[in-house]
Curated annotation (Swiss-Prot):
Family stated for the protein in its record: Belongs to the MsrA Met sulfoxide reductase family.
Molecular functions per Gene Ontology: L-methionine-(S)-S-oxide reductase activity; peptide-methionine (S)-S-oxide reductase activity
Active site feature: C55
SUPFAM superfamilies: Peptide methionine sulfoxide reductase
Keyword terms, alphabetized: Oxidoreductase
Cross-referenced InterPro entries: Met_Sox_Rdtase_MsrA_dom, Met_Sox_Rdtase_MsrA_sf, MsrA_MetSO_reductase
Functional note: Has an important function as a repair enzyme for proteins that have been inactivated by oxidation. Catalyzes the reversible oxidation-reduction of methionine sulfoxide in proteins to methionine.
Protein's name according to its UniProt entry: Peptide methionine sulfoxide reductase MsrA
A Pfam entry, by short name: PMSR
């Protein structure tokens, strides 16, 4: 989680690290804040959303503090390397970005409300960086789990682009792609709920200050 002065470039599938057929570490069984399992299968009626908005430590906290979120876990997504490690993701040779899987109850919090939180919690115009964190692993992304999620994500991007442009910001660089074919690989145990275990730890994400005109803003302090 530091400034890297090299120009980031996504690897091709041929250039990417091969990875391994099984993970080298075990994911904790329960969320340290919410108390629910990190890994599915999840209870009926819950939905899954995947977001990438910079350093996943601070990003995960944004979502677990949201009412209606049942569990969260951080991992690597959008690239080519199977079962990557954190060091491999940071090398820029996996193609993955740091992502947060959000399992939520749509009867309590809508996907559109999560999209609003996503857009307002980072600067989606920065390409392969987020603040001082530079690298392909910090790129902004939404990986959708249904046609309805894809339509909502696309509509929210268009709506947010209008207000960003009016405020003098650049074009959104967020990639919106289906989660199918882009597996979510859970990160190491020490990354899970990192800012709960380390309350004074690093949090490099920050928004543009521009409100996204969809959903309902979370309560103060979230």
């Amino acid at each position: 989680m530091f400034l890297n002065h090299r120009t980031p470039v996504l690897p091709t599938p041929e250039q990417a690290l091969r990875g391994r057929p099984v993970p080298e570490f075990t994911v904790p069984s329960r969320h340290t804040v919410l108390g629910n399992p990190l890994v599915g299968p999840y209870p009926d009626g819950l939905e899954v959303a995947d977001f990438a908005l910079g350093c996943f430590w601070g990003a995960e906290r944004k979502f677990w503090q949201t009412e209606g979120v049942w569990t969260t876990l951080v991992g690597y997504q959008g690239g080519y390397t199977e079962n990557p490690s954190y060091e491999e993701a940071c090398s820029g040779l996996t193609g993955h970005t740091e992502a947060v899987r959000v399992v939520f109850d749509p009867a309590v919090v809508s996907y559109e409300e999560l999209l609003k939180l996503f857009w307002e919690s980072h600067n989606p115009t920065q390409g392969f960086r987020q603040g001082n964190d530079v690298g392909t692993q910090y790129r902004s992304a939404i990986y959708t789990h249904s046609p309805a999620q894809a339509a909502a994500a696309d509509a929210s991007r268009a709506a947010y682009q209008k207000v960003l442009t009016a405020s003098g910001h650049q074009e959104i660089t967020t990639e919106i792609l289906p989660a199918e074919g882009r597996p979510f690989w859970p990160a190491e145990a020490y990354h899970q709920q990192y800012l709960d275990k380390n309350p004074g730890g690093y949090c490099g994400i920050g928004g543009t200050g521009v409100s996204c005109p969809i959903g309902v803003a979370p309560a103060d302090g979230r």
